[in-house]
């Protein structure tokens, strides 16, 4: 009889094979053992090897050192031998592999390189990583899950990527509207920030934004603001993924009296969060019109020395281009290229006022861009040449910008407006298709943030960031094309479940990591204070 443990790998009808009754059956048994070994951990493999050695069964030693593979004809021969010899693998031999989570029975929109869509698809997740993407039937036959999320009647998408916002500005939502960007910034926002922005303000405002984004299907956010230590702590506690940039600016800010203080704070921030699984710390010089050339160069050097992303507003409004031409004789993009700031670690927000040379320069340096249609429309800043940038090979993501200039964090609304704005601006209904827009909110947005190897699509080996979006509402019925439905019909309120790194953060619309009543209560408290002292209009 085999030693203890060998019965785990035995096959029905082979009880007498251990006495080496025939070469054919021996090799059939070896085949069973080989196939089973593909799914065993190292401890079990060693048990199989020990059994084979003790019974003098020849030939299978090599497969114990690593995964065993066979060609189709070898597999066919093995199955034929099994049939001739009466050797049939038992149910125990083909036991399912355990995984932590399976999301099943939804219409799976993978956004992988071939843009596969499974009508009844499933994703298997172990830890924070996707281990399988296939039909629900196939996943069910292979895996046993600790938890199953039933996605019937819904789409399963990669989590949405908000490529540009200012999370801590949500408490300024509606404070100053219907203004030009220049007036909005200099007459209202900068004064309000100097007066109200504190660590506590940033913490609660960030949590308010995280609450809105998770409810709307955003799983990764690129943020620029002050007190990013607090932003990072709140984001990590909520379980969201973030590329978070500490803002550098050329005048006293809420967390730094001088640019030198800001650089020191930023360097400490980079070192503190480096290597975190959810938080990617970044350097964020505000813009060329608020930062000196010296500060811009120092910011670029700091980002490079720490291998960190750099986030910056680029060519957002006409006044910026005029200022750049007057002071430097160059466009914003050409000026940034001249001083050595551009590179593959850079994300430029807005990128509206570009000429053809600017587009080619951004492509040459591998710069990512964020398209923020709502904010740009509201401040009449202009329309990004998104189609031209994409055609040149520039990775363009979609962002909301801060709630103070938008006034929400709704990525479904941004997708809808992105497609329609491009069509209207060019008088071309084919400009920026629904598929392209979904790409911009997922895999191309990941490219813009230089995170495409980790997120942006539902593929084996990538982080398990996904959302479940209901399609049963009247506004989503019927659904002939999933991409058209996502861009033109679905709403953020249709998001049912949000998963980041394999962890459900919202399930069946119930928040699991954020205290919604406390967040809303604190938001109301701050709003009352700001309205009383700042004189925000009530009508």
Model-derived regions, located:
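Active-site gating loops and adjacent loop-to-helix segments of metal-dependent hydrolytic enzymes
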Residues: 171-204, 241-263, 318-345, 365-368, ...
């Amino acid at each position: 009889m085999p030693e203890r443990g060998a019965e785990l790998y035995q096959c029905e009808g082979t009880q007498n094979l251990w006495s080496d009754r025939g070469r054919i059956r021996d090799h059939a048994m070896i085949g069973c053992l080989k196939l089973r070994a593909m799914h065993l951990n190292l401890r079990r493999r060693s048990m199989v090897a020990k059994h084979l050695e003790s019974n003098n069964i020849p030939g299978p030693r090599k497969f114990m050192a690593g995964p065993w593979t066979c060609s189709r004809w070898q597999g066919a021969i093995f199955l034929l031998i099994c049939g001739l010899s009466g050797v049939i693998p038992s149910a125990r031999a083909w036991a399912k592999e355990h995984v932590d989570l399976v999301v099943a029975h939804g219409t799976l929109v993978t956004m992988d390189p071939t843009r596969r869509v499974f009508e009844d698809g499933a994703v298997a997740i172990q830890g924070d990583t996707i281990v399988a993407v296939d039909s629900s039937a196939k996943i069910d036959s292979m895996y046993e899950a600790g938890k199953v999320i039933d996605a019937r009647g819904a789409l399963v998408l990669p989590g949405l990527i908000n490529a540009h916002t200012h999370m801590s500005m949500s408490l300024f939502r509606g404070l100053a509207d219907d203004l030009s960007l220049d007036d909005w910034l200099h007459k209202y926002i900068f004064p309000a920030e100097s007066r109200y922005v504190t660590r506590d303000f940033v913490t609660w405002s960030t949590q308010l934004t995280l609450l809105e984004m998770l409810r709307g299907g955003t799983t990764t956010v690129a943020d620029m603001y002050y007190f990013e230590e607090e932003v990072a702590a709140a984001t990590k506690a909520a379980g969201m993924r973030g590329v978070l940039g500490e803002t550098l600016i050329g005048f006293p800010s809420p967390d730094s009296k001088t640019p030198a203080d800001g650089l020191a704070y930023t360097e400490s921030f980079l070192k503190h969060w480096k290597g975190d699984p959810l938080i990617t710390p970044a350097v964020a010089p505000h813009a060329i019109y608020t930062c000196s050339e010296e500060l811009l160069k120092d910011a670029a050097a700091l980002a490079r020395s720490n291998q960190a992303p750099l986030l910056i507003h680029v060519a957002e409004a006409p006044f910026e281009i005029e200022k750049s031409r007057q002071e430097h004789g160059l466009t914003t993009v050409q000026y940034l290229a001249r001083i050595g700031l551009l590179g593959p670690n850079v994300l430029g927000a807005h990128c509206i006022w570009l000429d053809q040379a600017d587009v080619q320069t951004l492509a040459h340096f591998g710069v990512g861009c964020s398209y923020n249609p709502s904010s740009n429309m509201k401040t009449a800043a202009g329309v990004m040449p998104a189609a031209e940038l994409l055609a040149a090979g520039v990775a363009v993501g979609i962002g909301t910008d801060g709630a103070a200039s938008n006034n929400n964090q709704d990525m479904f609304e941004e997708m809808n407006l992105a497609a329609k704005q491009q069509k209207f601006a060019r008088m071309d209904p084919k400009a920026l298709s629904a598929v392209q827009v979904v790409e911009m909110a997922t895999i191309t947005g990941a490219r813009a943030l230089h995170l495409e190897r980790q997120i942006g699509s539902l593929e084996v080996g990538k982080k398990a960031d996904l959302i479940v979006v209901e399609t049963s509402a009247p506004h989503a019925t019927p659904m002939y094309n999933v991409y058209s439905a996502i861009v033109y019909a679905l709403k953020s309120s249709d998001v049912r479940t949000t998963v980041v790194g394999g962890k459900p953060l919202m399930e069946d619309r119930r928040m699991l990591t954020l205290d919604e009543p406390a967040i809303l209560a604190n938001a109301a408290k701050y709003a009352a204070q700001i309205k009383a002292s700042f004189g925000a209009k009530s009508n």
